[in-house]
Amino acid sequence: MRNQEIIRKAEMSLSALKSGGLMNPAQASAFIRMVQNTPTIFSESRVIQMENDSQKFEKIGFGQRILRAAQEGKALSNDELTVPTTSTVQLNTKEVIAEINITYDTLENNIEKDGLQQTIMQILAERAAVDIEELIVNGDTASADPYLAQLDGIRKQAVSHIVDMNGEELSRATFKKGLKAVPPKYLRIPQEFRFYTSHGLEVEWKDRVADRQTNLGDQAVQGGLSTAFGVPVKGVSNIQPYTVGEGDAQYDASDIILTHPKNIILGFSRNIRIEVDKDIRSRKFIIVLTAKLDSKFEEEDACAKLINVKE
């Protein structure tokens, strides 16, 4: 296929991605699924496709015992009746924008597979997912970084159960303190929770597990998923270490967040816009993606944050 034919086919494929710049519902849903399927924290979290830029989600739960001793022929008294506790999660999306460049060479390598549109969408999703994860994890409205200042991420939102490790090295006791910090009522199935931390601390824990002369040690060396008290320990690329102290007392530390993956809600507005331009001098297509999103804990009380864990 000649170069001009490739470019014409690429232009047709790119134009099919948009409708006045706005993705149609099917395209938006497909793109959101691609973002969710990337190897980020979203792959396990609860992703909600929002119809509007602002939306409330109801939470219903029973925070106390609902069963009573049954007495034949006698109904429960009024003070024995249980009323569900209700509250809402409010998501208010913030707009984010991304620009990627796809060169003609990239197109030439993919054009004859009859999957160019899918390839472009996949490239967009993979590149956007990492940046979205950075915002959802490290967002801080007090940040000097305009991108991160758009919203408070999960590290900032986790405030109810904070454990300061004061520079202690990672050990089994570290994870034990995290588990004991979360109210027991949430830990009915602890295996479904996750310890999210930096890749450095994940490697440190795998190294400690590998020292054991057991099958778990062998699995850790071979790259298997490590656990602590039955809870998987997962490294997240956007949980980065930070420096604590000064001079000789200075050290690198990181955080560990313990929560259920589905407790992290990522709200994605379906109003996703994609615009395309062509730079003939640089031989590339310029694709600009605009999306709106927000993230919250469904139950902030159901998570713990360990800070100042020595790397």
Swiss-Prot record:
Species: Bacillus subtilis (strain 168)
UniProtKB keywords: Secreted, Signal
Superkingdom of source: Bacteria
Designated name of the protein: Putative prophage capsid protein XkdG
Compartment annotation: Secreted
SUPFAM superfamilies in the cross-refs: Major capsid protein gp5 (SSF56563)
A single cellular component GO annotation: extracellular region
Protein family: Belongs to the encapsulin family. Family 3 subfamily.
The gene coding this protein: xkdG
Described function: Possibly a prophage capsid protein.
Signal peptide residues on this chain, from the entry's feature table: 1-9
